[in-house]
Amino acid sequence: MVYSYTEKKRIRKDFGTRPQVLDIPYLLSIQLDSFEKFIEQDPEGQYGLEAAFRSVFPIQSYNGNSELQYVSYRLGEPVFDVKECQIRGVTYSKPLRVKLRLVIFDKDAPAGTVKDIKEQEVYMGEIPLMTENGTFVINGTERVIVSQLHRSPGVFFDSDKGKTHSSGKVLYNARIIPYRGSWLDFEFDPKDNLYVRIDRRRKLPASIILRALGKTSAEILDIFFEKVNFEVKDQTLMMELVPERLRGETATFDIEADGKVYVEKGRRVTARHIRQLEKDGVNFIEVPVEYIVGKVSAKDYVNEATGELIITANQEISLEALANLSQAGYKKLEVLFTNDLDHGPFMSETLRVDSTTDRISALVEIYRMMRPGEPPTKEAAESLFESLFFSAERYDLSTVGRMKFNSSIGREDAEEQGTLDEVDIIEVMKKLISIRNGKGEVDDIDHLGNRRIRSVGEMAENQFRVGLVRVERAVKERLSLGDLDNVMPQDLINAKPISAAVKEFFGSSQLSQFMDQNNPLSEVTHKRRISALGPGGLTRERAGFEVRDVHVTHYGRLCPIETPEGPNIGLINSLSAFARCNEYGFLETPYRRVVNGVVTDEVDYLSAIEEGQFVIAQANAKLTEEGGFADELVTARQKGESGLHPREHVDYMDVATNQVVSIAASLIPFLEHDDANRALMGANMQRQAVPTLRSEKPLVGTGIERNVAVDSGVTAVAKRGGVIQSVDASRIVVKVNEEELIPGEAGIDIYNLTKYTRSNQNTCINQRPCVMPGEPVARGDVLADGPSTDLGELALGQNMRIAFMPWNGYNFEDSILVSERVVQDDRFTTIHIQELSCVARDTKLGAEEITADIPNVGEAALSKLDESGIVYIGAEVKGGDILVGKVTPKGETQLTPEEKLLRAIFGEKASDVKDTSLRVPNSVAGTVIDVQVFTRDGVEKDKRALEIEQMQLKEAKKDLTEEFQILEGGLLARVRSVLLAGGYTEAKLGSIERKKWLEQTLENEELQNQLEQLAEQYDELKADFDKKFEAKRRKITQGDDLAPGVLKIVKVYLAVKRRIQPGDKMAGRHGNKGVISKINPVEDMPYDENGQPVDIVLNPLGVPSRMNIGQILEVHLGLAAKGIGDKINQMIKEQQELAKLREFLQKVYDLGDTRQRVDISELSDEDVRTLAHNLRAGLPVATPVFDGAPESSIKAMLELADLPASGQLTLFDGRTGDAFERPVTVGYMYMLKLNHLVDDKMHARSTGSYSLVTQQPLGGKAQFGGQRFGEMEVWALEAYGAAYTLQEMLTVKSDDVNGRTKMYKNIVDGNHAMEPGMPESFNVLLKEIRSLGINIELEDE
């Protein structure tokens, strides 16, 4: 296979056996595509800003004399780029300008005559922009908008599963959920009447809604029931017979026709009887007159002579009524067909409980329910009902909702219609009744066909629409005020409500979250997170088990493993590796199509609904050479159930083994051997790994490390192929290949690297180049490594030599024993960057000042500040040191006569100000790596600010000049080639100044044209450079837009180096976490026969009960990988010839049954040398999830590395030199240092702040709080009878205010007595009892 330039530097041996059909898609596409859809101009107006504008505009005035129409919109250019926004603390956004047209109609002329048209572009606030990595910069911090999983709009049929009523009767209900608008619920009550609710209010009989639609009782019965006709013939009552309806009934009379008795009285009618009746074609049978009594009439029967009603629709028929009918001359009678089995009398019963009789009374009833207490008028009632479900402004099912609705009730037409109509409501009621009758199934609301994803774009669009609707009201008011002759669109629109709605969404919505930026993986997973919480979603408290559980439709869509532990479990999920959203927002997953029993490489994306119809084989099904299934019976899924299916029945096959799990879970090698609970912890803990000082790739990986590193955007990736022209720590310059050039550009790509920047989690973001000048690179190659990446692969931790054995109790209960060598080699040293800021405000007493002249502070404390009072860059500071000197004016105090005298003598004025300097927090010590000063417009900049400004200008100038020189060089090189082609010699060119080359004239017209073109480009380049520099200069020198009352802000960045120490939390990738208990000297650690000590000792008892065996396999494979690295190292040291090295490498890569084909002979000698050099530390291997290295391969690899096949070595005790009594499992495990550092947690309280009401000490490190002495601790002291200790705890150590101060005084005086008083919380209790109206006083006897 062809390796890219960076890949062949270190080829990972792959143990996977399944061929890769589909590469993992771009990991951030769910965010980027959604936002792209939001801001791109969509001519159809289906989604995005365009859709929002079209749904609100045109806005008409109330009187219809004028309207404001929307024409188009455009987004301007952002003022600052992403980095500048982060530094300045502003939002990265584009201004939105909308072209609107105000049309005024002529009142006097016929309708629609236009009197005046004005068009204008109006500013409508700022729209935050997504960065290329899928984040938003809001007020200078990077945020992510998490996608939401919510119930899809449409209609859902459900039941209460027998929980509502005490009898355990199952009550069915239907709910129509629109995208926006009122919910409509239909439900049965225990008496089997059908009711309707609107927006979950009081229930009404369901027939009311049909009456409100203008239906009469007879029409309603006609819709919901089949009819039975009775006829009077020759004094006998005949019944029309549909034999099928008799099934299961017991005959109450002989069923006979033409003298033949088919069913005797008292017998049950069976299928055989029915077949006979059908065969003989019996259509009418004679029935006794009593049979009709109690049946229900289907329509009104009127006596035509007198005009009186004999029987109304839905009335039970009596013998008397029957006699009246025959007297009035009716020969035929229609009754409703009902039975107890599958034609229940539900609607007929419901009509009986319905008090309304006509449309108006039904509308009034609905009005009373929606607006209780308001007097209903006919117009109000009609317009309310009309606007509830039938007005496009108030109600919208959305495309998705309509699609789901139609597929549920089986409707073909009305595809574009967002509102409901009569047919919809009737069909839903019909389906609900048929489900109650036992036909059809209820829906499963946790099925992913009924839950859809709302991503950034859609949520932003909804917020934007909310803002527009607020504006719409104001515009309507203004349009109706009249006098529009000199009004422009701009005067009508106030952009505040729009920008407020957008700002609120991006700044404080529950789904707009502070990005988790611990490492590249945590960034990627945060952007791929799917939450069921948030506005319009669930709440933690109300979500039950079913919602949180893994559903069969999660397969390949949502990860069953990666979800938080704790109250959010199952509500926050992660997207599976290959999943994507379709146009409706449903999750799809790819499958390989099987055609005529042969698995093809064609891939179809199926949603959860489509997937139900197919039989889908697993990715590890055995295939023949031709691509057919090797086994007769194949393990496959159908409708979510796994089972064995004949190979001819299989329609699809999974594309990859890690299709089921998320990216974080796919990074765990041997995941298939881990218990699910531990795998969950492993996936979650990888996200908390802190980037180490030197990243080290995992020896045992899964092969997708490269995808994560590249897609996360922390590395610098080549946009186009070319040759590296120059590299230094902060930038890489690439000369682009000829074939990838855009005509007329200079063909130079410049990559500026990020150096030592603070992340959201205070870890350090730093990019290091991993290429050398002159190296060829292709598009997509990694040029520079970011945090936690190594040669373009994700590298979250370090490979540590591990032994599984107990060691003097230091690894009791998951503790970890670490060798001192790990600390010496800085294996787990991390850099943390903190931002400390100092704000100078304008106070009532005068402005605060940033200065080095601070009262009552010695020289030593000021030694690290410059003359402006700001710390130097590079200063090493510790807790309590001053970083920025600041003084605040304080109010005039009354002076004693003595002080006045001293003032008069010494002129001491310093006491007017107090010292409010920014100091280093107590527990922190580090190095100042950067200082930034922001000065308000119009405030004079201090010396330091000017210095920083000069430095920034110099940097910018240097950057741009270098860029210009490189581009100029490229352009002049092309000029040179043109001139040489035109007959100039090298010597002649050398004698002319380079700038003058462009002014030469050539005989050849074509070449002359080219030269002139190049000259034009040169001028453009120069002008462009000047413009860029001017813009940059303006940005750097202009004042900053600071909050009101703020004059200056100084931000100081401290870099803190944290070595690993006891109390830090570490973990492997299999959920095996622990805390470091001791750092042991190297000489005391167990060592092997070669004298090599282990780095870490883990407790073997942590494995069996937790069932994460993956870690053991990883350790064995790690040992083999390292052993092979050692052999290669040995060969290099012995300077063996390349042929032997090639042969050995080929042997290694061919080991095992693998899909990977590495042909070492294709690599050049130089490539082989580089490869061997990079493999000396160990051969990196990949064991893909569910397709990992088998035991045989691990053993073969151990043998190839001349190691025991058991993976166990004899170890010797470092203290005594004696061998341990049995061989020990030793190997290499990839260990992570998690962001739970003891430095951030350790804390001790001295006298500190107290809570205001209870006067008890606060809790927590942030508040400098104490430990709570709670109820149970009090019991413990009571049990010991330690009365005085208890008294001390409850009084002077807690909330006895006078006792505390006395105690302090006593200690100072050396008198160690204690006088407890009344605890403040007792007073609080008294006050609370008094607030209940009971007075309690302590009476002194």
Curated annotation (Swiss-Prot):
Question: By its UniProt entry, which PROSITE patterns does this protein fall under?
Answer: RNA_POL_BETA
Gene3D superfamilies referenced in this protein's UniProt entry, alphabetically: 2.40.50.100, 2.40.50.150, 3.90.1100.10, DNA-directed RNA polymerase, beta subunit, external 1 domain, DNA-directed RNA polymerase, subunit 2, domain 6, RNA polymerase alpha subunit dimerisation domain
Q: What job does this protein perform?
A: DNA-dependent RNA polymerase catalyzes the transcription of DNA into RNA using the four ribonucleoside triphosphates as substrates.
What does the record note on quaternary structure? The RNAP catalytic core consists of 2 alpha, 1 beta, 1 beta' and 1 omega subunit. When a sigma factor is associated with the core the holoenzyme is formed, which can initiate transcription.
What is the protein name for this chain? Answer: DNA-directed RNA polymerase subunit beta
Source species of the chain: Vibrio cholerae serotype O1 (strain ATCC 39315 / El Tor Inaba N16961)
Which domain of life does the UniProt lineage start with?
Bacteria
Sorted alphabetically, which InterPro entries does this protein's record hold?
DNA-dir_RNA_pol_bsu_ext_1_sf (IPR042107), DNA-dir_RNA_pol_bsu_external_1 (IPR019462), DNA-dir_RNA_pol_su2 (IPR015712), DNA-dir_RNAP_su2_dom (IPR007120), DNA-dir_RNAP_su2_hyb_sf (IPR037033), RNA_pol_bsu_bac (IPR010243), RNA_pol_bsu_CS (IPR007121), RNA_pol_bsu_protrusion (IPR007644)
Enzyme Commission designation: 2.7.7.6
